[in-house]
């Protein structure tokens, strides 16, 4: 699937939003529950030839299967109005800059229209759905930039963890170029590299592929 474009195949009628919420409440794994929610939201937007991308801290949580947790689910959307309409039908209420669903324990923040870069976007399959997640390379640079700007040790730690876990999959040429543009220094791999399966066991059920 091409990032930012919907499939042109025939779609069966989607389940009603309330029915989806009812099913999500039954999912005991918090990360999987979030990903199923995002998958449903992605599916509804795809039907209208629009897209959402998972970015920020929730993308880090997803790639690390919960090693780093976050509060808000940060997404970008090519159609904010439609996205907000779907959230409303799912029982989310707007509170300032975020949409909150207390029953699901979720808060969604629509941060922009589209990510700055989409060429390294990954597709993660969960249940019957597919979620677009910002690429590892772009996420590492994003965390490094945040660490530099805010002098944040946590963001630097996240960048290091992502780099160590996915070092064999990273497009180093692309990463170096992006880091240079943002004027950030790349982390050095630790002597003991953490393998992706060790670090992200949930991804055994949420298969990541190049978009």
Whereabouts are the PLM-identified features?
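Compositionally biased terminal segments of proteins
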Residues: 2-211
């Amino acid at each position: 699937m091409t990032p930012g474009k919907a499939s042109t195949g025939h779609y069966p009628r989607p389940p009603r939003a309330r029915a989806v919420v009812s099913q999500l409440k039954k999912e005991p794994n918090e990360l999987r529950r979030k990903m199923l929610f995002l998958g449903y939201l992605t599916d509804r937007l795809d039907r209208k030839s629009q897209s959402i991308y998972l970015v920020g801290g929730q993308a880090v949580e997803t790639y690390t299967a919960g090693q780093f947790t976050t509060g808000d689910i940060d997404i970008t959307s090519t159609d904010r109005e439609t996205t907000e309409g779907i959230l409303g039908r799912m029982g989310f209420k707007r509170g300032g800059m975020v949409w909150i669903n207390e029953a699901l324990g979720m808060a969604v923040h629509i941060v922009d229209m589209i990510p700055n870069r989409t060429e390294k976007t990954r597709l993660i399959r969960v249940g019957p759905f597919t979620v677009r997640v910002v690429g590892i390379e772009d996420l590492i640079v994003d965390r490094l930039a945040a660490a530099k700007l805010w002098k944040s040790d946590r963001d630097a730690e996240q960048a290091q963890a992502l780099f160590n876990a996915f070092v064999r999959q990273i497009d180093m040429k692309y990463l170096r170029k992006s880091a240079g543009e943002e004027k950030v220094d790349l982390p050095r791999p630790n002597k003991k590299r953490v393998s992706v399966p060790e670090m992200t066991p949930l991804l055994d059920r949420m298969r990541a592929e190049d978009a």
